Amino acid sequence: MTPKQLLLFNSLSSYIEKTLGAKTLVTARDTGEMRRLNSILGEKAKFVGTYGKNKKEKLTAEAERIIELAELVDSFSPDYLVSYPSPSAVRVAFGLGIKTVIYSDTPHAFHVHALTIPLSDYFIFSSFIDKIKFERFITKGGWTRIFRYKGVEELAWVEGYTPNEEKVRKYGLEPYKYFLVRPPEIFASYYGWGTEGFKRIVKRLSENSKVALIPRYDDDALRYNDLNVEIISEPVLGLDLEYYSIATVSGGGTMSREAALLGVPSVTLFPLKIDVDAGLRSLGFPIYRATSYEEAMKIINGILTGSIKRVSESAAGKLEHPAIPLQKILEGDI
C-alpha cells in the first residue's frame, strides 16, 4: 500500500463506518513512510508484512504476508475485502471465501492487476479511464463486475477540507507567496526526467520565488539542500501547503490532483499520460502536464503572469465521490 492508498482506504473506512455502521479493519505494509502517515491519521492501520528489494525477497515477503494476513483476517471475519490490487490480500480473501472489491486508477500496473482482478467480485474505477485499458484483466466468462464513477480517488479525502493558514506559517511561509514542489519517483522504471531535470526546475523557481519542498525519499533533503528551498522534513498532509501555494509542481500525480481539486494550479511531470488527470482538465480543473523543462517553465510563467489562474468553483458539484459505488455494493443496491 502506498501513502495515497492509505489515505484512500482510511477515508473509505471512515465513510463506511459512518454511513453503514460497519466495522472495518485497515492494514498496510510496514515502512517508515507509512508509519509516519498512519500516526497523522490516528493510527488506524495495522501493519502486516514488509517489502523485498529483489525478486526473491519480494516473493518471500509476499508469502510471509499472506500467512500473517490469513491469521488476522480470519479472526476479524469480514464480509468484504476492499483493496487496491494487492495479490496477497486478494489471495487471502479468495482462500477464505470473502468477497473482494478492487479500486484502481493505474491501468499501466500490469502484474498486480493480472494477479488480482480475475479473482475479484467487483472492480471500481473512474469513468475518466478508458474501459479498454482494464479489459485485458477481466476474464471472459468470469464473475468480476465493473462499476465506474465520475470522479477521482483524491476526492475521498479532499472533500470537506477546511484551510488552516497557521499550518503554513509555522514553516515560515507566507500564504500565496510560495511554490510547493515534490520530487518524482526517480527510481521508477517509467520515469525519464532524471534527478537533474526536476532539480533544474526547482532551481529556476527558487531564484525568484519562495519554494517549499516535500521530500519523497529520505535523501531528498540532501539532494536539494544546495538550493534556496524550505524542506518540509516532518510528516505532513499536504492539503494546507497546497491550498496556500501559488502552484504545485510534482513528479507524481496525487499531489497535483489534490491541488487541482482545491482550485490551485498544478504542474505534473509524470511521464505517462494519465486519464484521470485529463478528465479533471476537461472539467476545468487547473492541472497541467509537462513533458519537458521548457514546457514546464512555460506553464509556470503562465501562472506567474496570471494567464493561468486559481479556480474557486467547488469540485463537489462536478464529481462523484469514490465511496458511492462501494456503498451501493455493500447495501446490495447493485
What do these predicted ranges mean?
Residues 18-62:
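Conserved nucleotide-sugar phosphate-binding/catalytic loop shared by glycosyltransferases and other
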Residues 31, 41-53, 181, 202-232:
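Catalytic donor nucleotide-activated moiety binding site of glycosyltransferases and closely related
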Residues 65-69, 218-255:
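Donor nucleotide-activated moiety binding/catalytic core segment of transferases
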Residues 81-92, 102-104, 241-278:
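A donor-sugar binding/catalytic signature common to diverse glycosyltransferases
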Residues 101-103, 113-125, 242:
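A conserved, positively charged/aromatic
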Residues 123-193:
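A nucleotide-sugar donor-handling region in carbohydrate enzymes
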Residues 261-307:
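Catalytic binding pocket for nucleotide-activated donors in carbohydrate/polymer assembly enzymes
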